[in-house]
């Protein structure tokens, strides 16, 4: 895939999915995901330069440490995170070559944990993952772009907000 994603068939996620299919809602739903890549165009034609994406990833690590790394289901236009739409928390990020990887914890409700009742965005995402749906991950941020041929290069004023779950 050319964009970030969470794949239920990824070997890193197989043990998580096996546990979740046993319907033990007491355990958190945690997954590994490709969050973003530098130096290659994504599906919307944007290219993130290495220097800019690494700078923003380092800044985002501070948000993770403070518990401020929430993200939403779907990808709103707003630069603000809407707590009614929060679906997951990024708990760790790291580099694998030019790929920014992450560990996500879906924020599910007590009703989902106790009875499988879907009532929050995190519940929806958890239920989709349990059913084997591959979801996309899209970085949300603000900043300018510069046209370079067919691609839009993200500029130095870019500020990363979060990594939303989207349809792939």
Description of each model-found segment:
Residues 35-37, 70-73, 104, 167:
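Pocket-edge structural micro-motifs
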Residues 37-46, 77-82, 109-117:
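Short, surface-exposed beta-strand/loop "edge" segments at domain boundaries and coil↔beta transitions
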């Amino acid at each position: 895939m050319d964009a970030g994603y969470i794949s239920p068939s990824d070997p890193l996620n197989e043990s998580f999915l096996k546990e979740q299919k046993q319907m033990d809602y007491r355990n958190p739903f945690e997954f590994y995901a490709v969050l973003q890549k530098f130096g290659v165009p994504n599906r919307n034609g944007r290219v993130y330069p290495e220097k800019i994406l690494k700078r923003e990833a380092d800044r985002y690590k501070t948000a993770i440490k403070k518990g401020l790394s929430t993200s939403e289901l779907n990808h709103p236009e707003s630069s603000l995170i809407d707590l009614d739409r929060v679906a997951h928390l990024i708990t760790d990020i790291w580099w694998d070559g030019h790929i920014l990887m992450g560990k996500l914890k879906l924020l599910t409700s007590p009703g989902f944990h106790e009875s499988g009742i879907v009532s929050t965005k995190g519940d929806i995402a958890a239920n989709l993952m349990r059913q084997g749906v591959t979801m996309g991950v899209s970085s949300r941020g603000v900043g300018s772009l510069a046209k370079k041929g067919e691609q839009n290069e993200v500029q130095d004023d870019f500020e990363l907000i979060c990594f939303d779950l989207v349809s792939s």
